[in-house]
UniProtKB/Swiss-Prot annotation:
Alphabetical keyword list: PQQ biosynthesis, Transport
PANTHER family reported in the protein's UniProt record: COENZYME PQQ SYNTHESIS PROTEIN B, HYDROLASE C777.06C-RELATED-RELATED
Pathway involvement of the protein, from the record: Cofactor biosynthesis; pyrroloquinoline quinone biosynthesis
Job description of the protein: May be involved in the transport of PQQ or its precursor to the periplasm.
The keyword Transport belongs to this UniProt entry's keyword annotation: yes
Alphabetical list of CDD domains matching this protein: PQQB-like_MBL-fold
Gene name of this polypeptide: pqqB
Cited InterPro entries: Metallo-B-lactamas (IPR001279), PQQ_synth_PqqB (IPR011842), RibonucZ/Hydroxyglut_hydro (IPR036866)
The keyword Transport belongs to this UniProt entry's keyword annotation: yes
Lineage: Bacteria, Pseudomonadati, Pseudomonadota, Gammaproteobacteria, Pseudomonadales
Protein name: Coenzyme PQQ synthesis protein B
TM annotation in the entry: none
Amino acid sequence: MYIQILGSAAGGGFPQWNCNCVNCAGFRDGSLRAQARTQSSIALSDDGINWVLCNASPDIRAQLQGFAPMQPGRALRDTGISAIVLMDSQIDHTTGLLSLREGCPHQVWCTEMVHEDLSTGFPLFEMLKHWNGGLTWNRIELQGSFVIPACPNLRFTPFPLRSAAPPYSPHRFDPHPGDNIGLLVEDTRTGGKLFYAPGLGKVDEALAEKMRDADCLLVDGTMWDDDEMQRRGVGTRTGREMGHLAQNGPGGMLEVLEGFPEQRKVLIHINNTNPILDEDSPERAELVRRNVEVAFDGMSIEL
């Protein structure tokens, strides 16, 4: 299985366009040793030719341009994208579909709850019908697994995650299973397994069992501290309120990951305020000590 990190930052990217926190300002003036990052998205393939896009970031055009296999050049109009999986209906994970309209129709896999949001509160399915048929919905059921025909050797097993629907959703304050999912993806030839959950607010025993079954854990790296937005002076909400488990502190992501010594551990969906973006920070050194990696745009993993 080929895993390509197209974007590794949380919403707004890094540096965020309107932010002057210590990280963003430091990156711009050159005092911070860090890499710029676009908004979270990955691509999966079983042959390096046909790719499944997991979430469609607002930065999708730049991400595709930066990854040569996404333009195989087999015809006058071509793309390496064979299918799209949406893990939720958040704006940061779906607005890229608008930039892919020239390539419609697209095969899109998502849950019923995500499809409902994208047909009502943010009606991308309706809007894109006007471009060569738009988006063809393939329902993700929360029980069992599914295979995408273009990548027949990859088996996708979805699982619900505790999280709120987007602010625009008609059921914003009435959460349902399927608002947000993670994926366990297995290459049935090699046996390699990826656990992918960029929005992970809590790890219970059922999730821990899936994590133990994986070779690589690509998980939520949004915030170092739960009150990070408040500490940095850029917001009032905590990580938990936004559905993200912070790395630091009792019960935090680093403590959780200590329970998986045999797995490769990679943090993704990193907020612009997170000190781990500073490659010289003590927080980054702590990740190195714990053998936890930080995803970056262009990172490649094979399982």
